[in-house]
Amino acid sequence: MEKGIAYGVGVGPGDPELMTLKAVRIIRENEVIAFPGGVPEETAAYRIAVQAVPELSAKILLGLDLPMTRDPEALADARKKAAETIAAHLDRGRNVVFLTLGDATIYSTFTYLQTLLQDMGHRTELVNGVPSFCAAAARLNVPLTEDRETLRVIPAWDEAAVNLREPGTYVLMKSGQHLARVKKDSAAAGL
């Protein structure tokens, strides 16, 4: 029996109209849908996707326990269990679609599972979604870059990388816990 494919599908930043046609097609064509969390309706990625693909609620739904913790052992254990759960379906020839916020290639939970699944011999594919920072710029009606400007996408927790004195546009990802410092650094840089 041919093994299934694990798809990491970005569902965009929150507006179901921003889901890509490919994301919608991949979700529609496959019967097993995975997402981080236990209850579908409490998971942001599921809530976005089900608005664009209402038939999603009738599919096989896999809520995967992927806690938001900094404990490396707990993370490794949860990711291993989630990958094994997905692999069980792949081994039966079923494709599995893992829903992730934004774009599947930018700070996505799926990329950790992707590595584990590939190590198990499974095929994976990433399906792009609209990144939150692109949607925010469009919502504000401002370009991220013009002409030869530089665009820097930086994790806000990496203080060494956040040098706001360099020219260009900065996108500081994962800034929630670091917002006070980001504001202070921005003010110090005259922004």
Residue ranges and their predicted role:
Residues M1-P16, L21-V24, R28-H122:
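Class I S-adenosyl-L-methionine
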Residues P13-P16, V39-P40, W157-E159, S175-H178:
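Short beta->alpha connector loops
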Residues V32-I33, P143, Y170:
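Short, well-ordered beta-strand core segments
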Residues G102-E166:
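Class I SAM-dependent methyltransferase SAM-binding "motif I" and its flanking Rossmann-like core
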Residues A6, V96, L164-L191:
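A contiguous loop/helix-start segment that scaffolds small-molecule binding in enzyme catalytic cores
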Residues T43-A45, P72, A135-A137, R181-V182:
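Short, charged, surface-exposed secondary-structure boundary motifs
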Residues F35, T100, I154, M173-K174:
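Thr-Gly-centered strand-to-loop micro-motif
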Residues F35-P36, L64, V127, D147, ...:
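Generic beta-sheet signal
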